[in-house]
Swiss-Prot record:
Keywords: Glycoprotein, Heme, Iron, Membrane, Metal-binding, Monooxygenase, Oxidoreductase, Transmembrane, Transmembrane helix. It comes from Aspergillus fumigatus (strain ATCC MYA-4609 / CBS 101355 / FGSC A1100 / Af293). It is found in: Membrane. This is Cytochrome P450 monooxygenase helB1. Its main location: membrane. Its EC number is 1.-.-.-. One of its GO terms (molecular function) is oxidoreductase activity, acting on paired donors, with incorporation or reduction of molecular oxygen. Pathway: Mycotoxin biosynthesis.
């Protein structure tokens, strides 16, 4: 057997000729030595030993470096980069704002998910003005003129945030971002939401709205031997608006008010909170956090199946008897056609719109009614005046309609307007963005690609529009159509709330009929009332959380009131309050 030996003449492998300097550098390097050790086992032991000695020389230094020090170095490097970007590179560097907001989105995300975004924004506006940095590449705007400029322009589209409202891959009227598609959908759905169509659907709205409340409350009073009875006006108005929307959107009824609860409604409220934070939703999609969302996913699948079945049942009904179509939202959506393109919605689009209308429409409307009752209870003189108006105009057995309120109850209507101004149900921030057009607001140039967060609450409390804005004063809206146009509760411009007319029918009929038929008062142990005031002498509102809508933080504690059935010829009595 022939044997071979590696000649120790050269330690180079065959290949291109290298410059002498490069060979010397390579052969003298640690890497080169290890490379030689692997190729030349005779020389390898000496080479490895030499390398280990050289590494050992640095061991004391390596021992001093901990994981925490490495992380600290990374943090300092990242912070330095963000500081340089925020103060020297960012196109928003000349706009005032909190330091933390310039460096990270975490500040905004924490406030949003905690429901404290309104309080934080109010403090920021007082310190930085009507335009300030909200995130590293986003601003928050608060002046009414600026809000009109942004929301009134098709250039500023809804930001990617709204994708979370999609029904899977199917967008709806809330989440559509392309102006052309959004305009087509509004043309398809618009006919249902005009007052002429809603007037025909009003009996259904009253049946599942105020009449359902009256049935429940009368039963509670009867069970209590006719004595004053405690109810929760947040829960009950939430249940009936949910029933209204389910009847209109699906042609079917959950009967939530008669059962006293609805699991779907509770999960709907929870998801409305979670939808405000895409980061949290992303986290909840991962194990083990995804287990938290399993009940909601099951509910949503059931709701989607419920919606799909409703569409199929309606089509079957029409196939059997098409002489008279039901007057509800479901039928309107099935028949909906864009008058320009003649395009109808697909079954998936009908389902997406029905689900969104039920989830969003029920929560926001019930929130508005809840704040109206809360403010009336805080201002007893205003409550007495509203009660006197409605009881002077209509008898006990008269069911007040939307038309009745508009024609005969201007003060009751003004109370609802003022509640929407004082405590707007849509009090969060809504983001817009333009990738092609910049805009100058309050002297600051906002370049294309910047997210603009619109504070819909700010115009309702802005001193340029309202005197003494913190005071609940319905007189602002008496004989003042201009003030009514100043409200931003239903947004503004081409993407304003399509369902606002339906909301008005629900709000006015429920509030007016409750004031006509019941004496309402705070419970004896209520923490918030006219007896507990702030430094300006104004009643303190119950604490609230603001997500997509504004909700009470503790509804079980703070949304209780005592009701007494009004008897013919008996005047309401006013409770006396003592200072807290």
């Amino acid at each position: 057997m022939r044997t071979y030996a590696i000649r120790p003449v050269s330690n180079r492998l065959p290949g291109p000729i290298e410059p002498k300097k490069h060979r010397r550098d390579r052969d003298n390097s640690t890497t080169g030595s290890l490379y030689n050790a692997l190729i030349h086992p005779v020389q390898g032991e000496k080479t490895i030993t030499s390398t280990m000695i050289r590494v050992a020389e640095f061991q004391p230094f390596l021992n001093t470096i901990s994981v925490l020090q490495v992380l600290a170095a990374i943090f300092i490097g990242a912070l330095t980069y963000r500081l340089i970007d925020a103060f020297f590179l960012s196109p928003l560097r000349s706009i005032p704002g909190p330091l933390l907001a310039r460096l990270t989105t975490k500040r905004a995300n924490v406030d949003t998910f905690s429901g404290k975004v309104t309080q934080t924004v109010d403090k920021d506006v007082a310190r930085y003005g009507d335009v300030y940095v909200y995130k590293p590449r986003a601003v928050c705007i608060n002046h009414p003129d600026d809000i009109r400029a942004v929301l009134g322009s098709q250039e500023f589209r809804k930001a990617a945030f709204f994708d979370i409202f999609n029904d899977g891959n199917t967008p709806n009227i809330v989440s559509l971002r392309e102006p052309e598609l959004a305009n087509r959908r509004r043309r398809q759905l618009g006919p249902f939401f005009n007052y002429a169509y809603l007037g025909r659907a009003e009996p259904l709205i009253l049946q599942h709205g105020y009449q359902a409340i009256r049935t429940k409350w009368d039963a509670l009073i009867q069970a209590n031997s006719g004595r004053p009875t405690e109810v929760n006006y947040r829960t009950d108005t939430q249940l009936v608006t949910f029933d209204i929307m389910s009847a209109l959107a699906f042609g079917r009824n959950f009967n939530a008010i008669s059962r006293g609860s609805s699991s779907i409604m509770k999960w709907a409220g929870l998801i409305m909170e979670m939808l405000e934070s895409p980061a949290v939703l992303a986290l909840l999609s991962l194990l083990p956090f995804s287990l938290i969302m399993r009940p909601w996913k099951i509910m949503y699948r059931e709701l989607a199946a419920f919606s799909s079945d409703a569409v199929d049942m309606r089509k079957q009904l029409l196939a059997e008897d098409s002489t008279e179509k039901p007057l509800d939202m479901l039928q309107a959506f099935i028949d909906a056609e864009d008058p320009e393109s003649k395009i109808k919605m697909s079954p998936h689009e009908v389902q997406a719109e029905s689900i969104m209308m039920m989830l969003a429409g029920s929560e926001t409307t019930s929130s508005a009614i809840m704040w109206t009752f809360h403010l009336l209870l805080l201002y007893p003189e205003t409550l007495r005046r509203a009660v006197h108006e409605v009881r002077s105009a209509f008898s006990l057995n008269h069911l007040v309609t939307y038309k009745d309120v508009r024609s005969s109850l201007p003060y009751v209507e003004a109370c609802v307007y003022e509640a929407l101004r004082h405590s707007p149900t849509t009090a969060g921030l809504t983001p817009r963005i333009s990738h092609s057009t910049g805009i100058t607001l309050q002297g600051y140039y906002i370049p294309p690609g910047t997210e603009i967060y619109v504070n819909l609450r700010s115009p309702s409390m802005h001193p340029s529009l309202w005197d003494d804005p913190a005071r609940f004063n319905p007189d602002r809206f008496l004989d003042s159509d201009n003030n009514k146009r100043l409200l931003f509760t239903f947004s503004y411009g081409p993407r304003n709330c399509l369902g606002r007319n339906l909301a008005w029918v629900e709000m006015l009929t429920i509030v007016a009929n409750v004031l006509k038929d019941y004496d309402i008062a705070l419970t004896e142990d209520s923490l918030f009332g006219p007896h507990c005031t702030d430094e300006n002498g104004l009643p303190v509102l119950m604490p609230a959380k603001c997500f997509i809508a504004s909700f009470p933080a503790k509804p079980e504690r703070d949304c209780r009131m005592v009701i007494t059935r009004r008897m013919a010829g008996v005047k309401a009595c006013a409770r006396e309050y003592s200072p807290c």
